[in-house]
């Protein structure tokens, strides 16, 4: 879920025992309940805390977290309205006392930041920018007052990293808000926070959170999948993560990293082992992830998690994409009538906020049945089954220009991730030469991948050429995501 990594990082700002921000045993348990999406239990504990310790500010922060998570995970209008209605009241409560605590300004920044991200989710972009700007200012001021405060580093690290991904044509908006930041700067700040937490037994309960932040930046912004995978493997060795299966957000985080690393079997095992519980707020996106992972392995039961997601999720994002995957499933399993039904449903439900859903709608509107060899190769590649993906393309022949373009692109991607870079490069270049004037994403993503190959080889001139080429292309599919990654690449190699 491309938006979730950006949204969920806001969850992982924890609390400690300080003045009016007392993270006592009751609040720690409420926080754990919240992390595990046991919202009712967490809310009940916070009601009790307000009666026992009326000066403690922690309940207002945890209550806002709960409302925020409902908005992000459930995407329902009523929850969004509830979050907005309570924003000013909670800010007033947090500003009453505790001025000498680093949590005083930080907690207010979190309220604004969560409000801003929720507004983005519901397309209120102007108000979102105002909220995020206010959060940024509060974090900067708090850093001036408390330069060693660990969660300042985490919060600003994420914001600085995200600022560094803004494409050059939108940098004017960043400058107008006087935002500053780069991916290396943000990554460094989050690493500092992680090391500080890892070395202090008193902060050990923050370890999963800071690792989540670090893996988020490493995976999504620094584009270093092996490093992100290595971090997760290290975290899995820690006894602190025996509760992983109890925390859906951690399950999501690890599954996302395994997926990007081509460890699809691990994705399926992790998500299959997770058990939904009636005492937890339902995170239906995990069903979607499981269905996609199973389809990437061409499993015969891949349809069931996708149907579960579509039958229960009341939000709008990834609905069209789920229908597209179901259509592909029935095409692969030779049920043409079911295939047609789900192609039509793509047009009827969902929205176009995320790249995946826009691709699904375009797919349905074109009404062109995909070539089975290309489709299987795409899915198997997404699952990391590179030999099977290559075999699916053996014997592929076509006179269709777009299908041929996808064929060269798929071969480039397969060889690239199969660690056969020199075989991938000519296929990427052929895709760029044949498709840079077409609206499809194949040429742009080929240029992005070449930029990453040359960056890792320390050939920064070539890397800069290909990253810049992405930003010069005019294409429709996955435009926001691919352009952001290209801009992030340029920022990483700036001055090299």
Which residue stretches match the model-derived regions?
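Residue-level recognition of tetratricopeptide repeat
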Residues: 31, 65, 72, 110, ...
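Residue-level detector of the short coil/turn that links helix A to helix B
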Residues: 37, 123, 222-223, 262, ...
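Short coil/linker segments at helix-helix boundaries
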Residues: 21-25, 33-46, 60-234
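Alpha-helical repeat scaffolds
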Residues: 45-47, 79-96, 127-140, 171, ...
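Alpha-helical adaptor scaffolds
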Residues: 211-215, 219-220, 259-260, 371-384, ...
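Alpha-helical segment of the N-proximal tetratricopeptide repeat
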Residues: 25-39, 371-388
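Solenoid-like repeat scaffolds
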Residues: 20, 47-54, 98-99, 145, ...
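Generic helix N-cap/helix-start motif at coil->alpha-helix transitions
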Residues: 20-26, 101, 149-150, 168, ...
């Amino acid at each position: 879920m491309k938006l979730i990594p950006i949204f969920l990082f806001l969850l992982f700002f924890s609390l400690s025992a300080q003045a009016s921000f007392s993270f006592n045993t009751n609040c720690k348990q409420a926080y754990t309940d919240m992390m595990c999406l046991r919202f009712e239990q967490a809310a009940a504990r916070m009601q009790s805390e307000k009666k026992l310790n009326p000066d403690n500010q922690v309940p207002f922060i945890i209550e806002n977290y709960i409302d925020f998570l409902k908005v992000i995970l459930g995407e329902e209008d009523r929850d969004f309205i509830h979050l907005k209605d309570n924003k000013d009241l909670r800010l007033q409560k947090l500003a009453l006392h505790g001025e000498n605590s680093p949590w005083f300004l930080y907690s207010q920044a979190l309220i604004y930041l969560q409000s801003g991200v929720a507004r983005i989710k519901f397309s209120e972009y102007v108000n979102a920018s105002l909220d995020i700007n206010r959060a940024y200012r509060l974090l900067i001021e708090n850093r001036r007052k408390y330069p060693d405060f660990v969660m300042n580093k985490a919060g600003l690290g994420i914001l600085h990293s995200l600022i560094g991904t803004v494409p050059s044509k939108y940098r004017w908006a960043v400058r107008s808000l006087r935002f500053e930041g780069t991916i290396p700067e943000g990554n460094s700040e989050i690493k500092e926070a992680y090391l500080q937490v890892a070395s202090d037994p008193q902060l050990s309960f923050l370890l999963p959170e800071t690792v989540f932040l670090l893996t988020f930046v490493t995976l999504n912004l620094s584009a270093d999948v092996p490093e992100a995978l290595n971090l997760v493997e290290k975290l899995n060795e820690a006894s602190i993560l025996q509760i992983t299966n109890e925390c859906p957000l951690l399950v999501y985080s690890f599954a996302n990293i395994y997926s990007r690393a081509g460890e699809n079997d691990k994705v399926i095992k992790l998500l299959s082992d997770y058990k939904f519980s009636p005492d937890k707020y339902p995170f239906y996106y995990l069903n979607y992830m499981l269905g996609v992972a199973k389809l990437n392995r061409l499993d015969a039961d891949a349809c069931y998690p996708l149907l579960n997601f579509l039958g229960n999720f009341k939000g709008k994002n990834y609905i069209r994409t789920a229908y597209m995957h179901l259509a592909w499933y029935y095409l692969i399993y030779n049920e043409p009538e079911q295939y047609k039904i789900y192609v039509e449903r793509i047009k009827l439900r969902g929205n176009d906020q995320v790249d995946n859903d826009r691709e699904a709608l375009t797919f349905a509107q074109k009404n062109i049945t995909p070539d089975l060899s290309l489709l299987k190769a795409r899915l198997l590649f997404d699952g990391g089954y590179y030999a099977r993906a290559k075999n699916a393309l053996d014997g592929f022949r076509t006179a269709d220009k777009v299908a041929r373009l996808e064929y060269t692109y798929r071969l480039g991607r397969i060889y690239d991730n199969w660690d056969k870079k020199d075989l991938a490069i000519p296929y990427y270049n052929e895709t760029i030469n044949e498709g840079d004037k077409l609206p499809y994403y194949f040429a742009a993503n080929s240029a992005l991948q070449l930029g990453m190959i040359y960056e890792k080889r320390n050939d920064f001139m070539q890397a800069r050429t290909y990253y810049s080429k992405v930003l010069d292309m005019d294409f429709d599919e996955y435009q926001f995501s691919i352009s952001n990654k290209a801009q992030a690449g340029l920022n990483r190699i700036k001055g090299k």
